[in-house]
Curated annotation (Swiss-Prot):
It comes from Cutibacterium acnes (strain DSM 16379 / KPA171202). One of its GO terms (molecular function) is argininosuccinate lyase activity. Keywords: Amino-acid biosynthesis, Arginine biosynthesis, Cytoplasm, Lyase. Pathway: Amino-acid biosynthesis; L-arginine biosynthesis; L-arginine from L-ornithine and carbamoyl phosphate: step 3/3. It is found in: Cytoplasm. It comes from the Bacteria. InterPro entries: Arg_succ_lyase_C, Argininosuccinate_lyase, Fumarase/histidase_N, Fumarate_lyase_CS, Fumarate_lyase_fam, Fumarate_lyase_N, L-Aspartase-like. Its EC number is 4.3.2.1. Belongs to the lyase 1 family. Argininosuccinate lyase subfamily. This is Argininosuccinate lyase.
C-alpha cells in the first residue's frame, strides 16, 4: 500500500515501486515507529481529534501491533513501500480503516522518519558505548597484569624509547573513552524531537510537539520545522563517530598483527580467536585483527557516502534522504560484530614479555636518555643532542649498543660523558626517569590505570542507559 495516490490517475510503475521500497533496511525502526504513533495518538486525543473511545481503540490496536512485530507474527510485505506504510496496514487490520486512518492527521513521513532515526541512533550510541567501555576495561586489566614489563616504544616504526607495555596498552584505551564521550556529546544534539514538523511547515491542528517529545524520551522538540525535517547533520555526526571507532580499532589491530608475526613474537593469540589456512597446516592467522583493519575502510566509506548524499540538498525534505539510513545501519551492524570479537581477542592474548624486554633497549633507544642526562649536567640540549648522536655513531661503527661502549670510549667522545652516565643506560632506568604526569614511569602508569578505570566508571551511566 502507499500513503499517497488521490492526485494520481494510476499506481506507480513496477520499476518505480521496486526503486522506492525500503523495508529491507528500515524495518529495524518498526518498534520506534509504533512508539511514535502511540505518542502521536496521545496528542490527537488531547487536541480533540480522537474521542476517548477512539483513543482507547487506537492504543489497543497499536499495542497489539507492537506485540505482533516483536514476536515476528507481523512483517512487511512486498507491496509495502516502507516501514511506515507496512505498520499503517497493520494498524488498519487491527483497528479498522476508519479508525486506523485517523492516525495520519497532523504528521508526515518527513517528520516521522527523522524522529524515529534520532531515537534509534540514541539507543545504538548507548549500546556501542557500553561495548567500547568493555574493551577499554579489558585493556586496563591486561595493563595491570603485565606489571612493569617493558617494550620498545616506536616512532616511524623504528625503535624510539623504552616504555612500559602497560603504557602502550593504555594508549589504545584512552581513544575508546573519547569515542564514548563523542557518542555522549552527540546525544545532546540527537535529544530533540522533530515530531510535529509535518512535511516542513508544522501543523495547523493544534497538536503539542513537546508532549510527543516527552513521550518519546526527548528533552524538547525542534525550534524550526524546516530544519527538523531536513537536518541530517546529527546522522552524519553519528557516522563520523562510528568511523572514528573503526580507525581506533584498526590501529589497535594493526599493532596486534605486527606483534603476532614470528619476527616480533610479542603476543600469542588464543586459538578460539584465530583461524587457520585451507592449504598450509601450520598457519594460525589473526583474522579478527585483519577484519577490523579492513572494516575500518568500510566504516569510513559509509561516512563518505552519506556526506556525498547530503551535499547540495535544498531545503527541506528530498527523497535523497532515504539514503541516510543504510550507511549508519551498516556501521552499527559492523561494530556490533567487531567489538565483541576484538574484546575477546585482547582479553585472551598472552604477551611474551621476555621477548619484548630483549628488544626494548636495542636500536639505540636510550640515546635520548644520554642527551637528557647531559642536560641535567648543565650541557645545552643542542650540544647534548650532538654528543649523544656521536655515541650512537661510535657504537654503530662497532656493531654494538650504547651501553656496550667502554668508559674510555665515552670519555674519548667528550669528557663530560663520565661513568655516571651509565645510570640512564638501562631500560629500567630510562623508564623510571619518565616520572611526569602522562609518562611511562611505573608509578605514573599505576596512577593512570586507576584514572582510566574511574573514567570508565563515570561513563557507565551513559553506556548502560536506555532511551524510552
Amino acid at each position: 500500500m502507499a500513503l499517497w495516490g488521490g492526485r494520481f490517475s494510476g499506481g506507480p510503475s513496477e520499476a518505480l515501486a521496486a526503486l522506492s521500497v525500503s523495508t529491507q533496511f528500515d524495518w529495524r525502526l518498526a518498534r520506534h515507529d509504533i512508539a511514535g504513533s502511540s505518542a502521536h495518538a496521545g496528542v490527537l486525543h488531547a487536541a480533540g481529534l480522537l474521542d476517548d473511545d477512539q483513543y482507547e481503540g487506537m492504543m489497543k490496536a497499536l499495542n497489539a501491533l507492537e506485540e505482533d512485530v516483536v514476536s515476528g507474527r507481523f512483517v512487511a510485505q512486498p507491496e509495502d513501500e516502507d516501514v511506515h506504510t507496512a505498520l499503517e496496514r497493520g494498524l488498519m487490520e487491527r483497528a479498522g480503516k476508519d479508525l486506523g486512518g485517523r492516525l495520519r492527521a497532523g504528521r508526515s513521513r518527513n517528520d516521522q522518519i527523522i524522529a524515529l532515526l534520532r531515537r534509534y541512533l540514541r539507543e545504538e550510541a548507548r549500546s556501542l558505548a557500553g561495548e567500547l567501555l568493555g574493551l577499554a576495561h579489558v585493556l586496563s586489566r591486561q595493563a595491570e597484569d603485565v606489571g612493569d614489563a617493558v617494550i620498545a616504544g616506536r616512532t616511524h616504526m623504528q625503535h624510539a624509547q623504552p616504555v612500559l607495555l602497560a603504557h602502550q596498552l593504555l594508549a589504545h584505551a584512552w581513544p575508546l573513552l573519547r569515542d564514548v564521550q563523542r557518542f555522549r556529546d552527540l546525544d545532546a544534539r540527537l535529544d530533540c524531537s522533530p515530531y510535529g514538523s509535518g512535511a516542513l511547515a508544522g501543523s495547523s491542528l493544534g497538536l503539542d510537539p513537546e508532549a510527543v517529545a516527552r513521550d518519546l524520551g526527548f528533552s524538547s522538540s525542534v525550534p524550526n520545522s524546516i530544519d527538523g525535517t531536513a537536518a541530517r547533520d546529527v546522522v552524519a555526526e553519528f557516522a563520523f563517530v562510528a568511523a572514528q571507532v573503526g580507525v581506533d580499532l584498526s590501529r589497535l589491530s594493526e599493532e596486534i598483527i605486527i606483534w603476532n608475526t614470528r619476527e616480533f613474537g610479542y603476543v600469542t593469540l588464543d586459538d578460539s580467536f584465530s583461524t587457520g589456512s585451507s592449504i598450509m597446516p601450520q598457519k594460525k592467522n589473526p583474522d579478527i585483527a585483519e577484519l577490523a583493519r579492513g572494516k575500518a575502510g568500510r566504516l569510513i566509506g559509509d561516512l563518505a557516502g552519506l556526506m556525498a548524499s547530503l551535499k547540495g540538498l535544498p531545503l527541506a525534505y528530498a527523497r535523497d534522504l532515504q539514503e541516510d539510513k543504510e550507511p549508519v545501519f551498516d556501521q552499527i551492524d559492523q561494530l556490533h560484530l567487531l567489538l565483541p570479537a576484538i574484546t575477546g581477542m585482547v582479553d585472551t592474548a598472552v604477551f611474551n614479555t621476555d621477548r619484548m624486554a630483549e628488544m626494548a633497549g636495542q636500536g639505540f633507544s636510550l640515546a635520548t636518555d644520554v642527551a637528557e642526562w647531559l642536560v641535567r649536567q648543565g650541557v645545552p640540549f643542542r650540544v647534548a643532542h650532538e654528543l649523544s648522536g656521536a655515541c650512537v655513531r661510535g657504537a654503530e661503527s662497532q656493531n654494538k649498543e650504547l651501553a656496550d661502549l667502554t668508559d674510555q670510549e665515552l670519555i674519548a667522545i667528550d669528557p663530560r660523558l663520565t661513568p655516571q652516565v651509565r645510570e640512564v643506560m638501562t631500560v629500567q632506568g630510562s623508564v623510571r626517569s619518565r616520572a611526569g604526569r602522562g609518562g611511562t614511569a611505573p608509578e605514573r602508569v599505576a596512577e593512570q590505570i586507576t584514572e582510566l578505570r574511574e573514567a570508565i566508571a563515570g561513563l557507565r551511566s551513559f553506556g548502560e542507559a536506555e532511551t524510552r
